C-alpha cells in the first residue's frame, strides 16, 4: 500500500527514541540493543537484522605513556572479552573483528585478524608485568553518553580491565564535547566508538598513517605507513589487496586499538506495515 506521507524525527537520545517507539509515536527505529528488541516482543513489531558496517572498538591514545607501549596495548586486547560484549549488547549477532575493516569490504577484508587475540586475562597480566605495569595503571575511557551501545560496552570493558589491575574511570560526555575534545583535539586516553567508511579500503585504514589529519589516536608505525602507501598508490589490484590485508594484520598485531565487532543492526518495524 502507498503512504500519504513520511515523517522523519531526529531524536538525540537513543533511550528517548526507544520510549517513543514503545508509545507508538514512531514506527521504525534502528540500532536497537538485543535487550530492547527482546523487550518489544513480536506482537507489534518485526525485528529486522542487518549490520551497522562499523568498526566498533576501544580506540587508544598512543601518546598516553602506558599506551605508548605495544605490550600494554596487547594486554588490553587480551583482557577484553569481545564475545561477552557481543552477547550482552547485541545478542551474539554481531561479527567479531580484529582490525580496522568490516567483512562487507569483501576481498580487502583480512579474516585472520579476528583470531590474533583471544580472551586471556592471565596473558594480559603477564604482558603488563613485562611492560613494567605489574600493579596496573589508571585509564580514563571517554564515551559519548547519547549512544547506549558505546556506554554499555565501555562499562563491560571497565569491569574486565579491573580484573587485570587496570583502574578505569568512565567519562561520559555530550556528543559535541566528544567531537571537539576527542576526535578533533585528540585529548583523551581511550574511547569507545564506532567508525564507518566508504567502499574504498583506503578510507578505513588511512587514519592510522602517522601524519594523517584524522589520526586522532596519535598512532605511528613506519612499517604500517609503508604498507598502506604501497596499497594506496599501486595500480595493481593484487598488490593493493595484499597490502591492505597486510596493513590490517599490522594494526591487529601492534594492537593499535582494541577491536571488538561490526555490530548487528537490529531494526524495529511496526507490524502496521505488514
Segments from the language model and where they lie:
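A ligand-binding cleft/hinge motif common to bilobed small-molecule-binding domains
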Residues: 32-43, 197-202
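A bilobed periplasmic-binding-protein/Venus flytrap-type ligand-binding module shared by bacterial periplasmic
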Residues: 52-75, 79, 88, 263-264
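Immediate post-signal peptide segment of exported/extracytoplasmic ligand-binding proteins
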Residues: 1-4, 70, 121-140
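Structural transition elements
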Residues: 96-130, 147-150
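Short, well-ordered beta-strand elements
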Residues: 3-9, 136-145, 168-171, 189
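Ligand-site clamp/hinge motif
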Residues: 1-38, 167
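Short helices/loops that flank or line small-molecule/ion binding pockets
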Residues: 15-25, 39-42, 71, 155-164, ...
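Detector for C-terminal structural segments
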Residues: 77-108, 149-158, 179-274
